[in-house]
Amino acid sequence: NRMSPHFIFNVLNQEMGSRDGENKKELSSLVKLMRRNLELAEQMCVTLKEELGFVQTYIDLQRRSLGPEFKVTIEVGEDVDTNQLLLPSMLIQIPVENAIKHALQGKEGERRLWIDVHRSGTYICVRITDNGGGFKLNSANRGTGTGMKVIMQTIQILNAKNKEMIETSVHNIPLPDGETGCEVSF
């Protein structure tokens, strides 16, 4: 049994009409995020600009529950053309969601998330890093890994078709302030 996305968006848009101010803005962002998620889920690759726009909408929605201690830094190298660079859909969003959900939500104190996209020779490097204590294999807060499996399967398909391989790494890193973080890189 499936619900029609058209029906869901009609109901949400009707609900949005009955709200005002900040409540309307939040619901509008949620609707935008859901609509864009459906669109992106149908595409194998998107531009970096599209992916970062989607990620920014997601981060903005999460900001309320994470509070003022949640700080995000997004850096894109000047030599990276966000309109031309294609990458697998959800490549950045899924690790960002994982970082927020599994590392930063329950963290005390400052919660940091860094997204860095830069050129290294002929390659583009994408890094998503958090200060949530690092990846713990046996943690109770660990998810099912479904999101990362989707990314890995997509990368596997692309690597089978393309000359240039996409390499993936998930590892814990020491941060300059003495904390440990998790870094996902492509």
Q: Each predicted region: which residue ranges?
A:
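Two-component histidine phosphotransfer core
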Residues: 1-171
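Short C-terminal beta-strand
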Residues: 180-186
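A short beta-turn/loop motif at secondary-structure boundaries
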Residues: 175-176
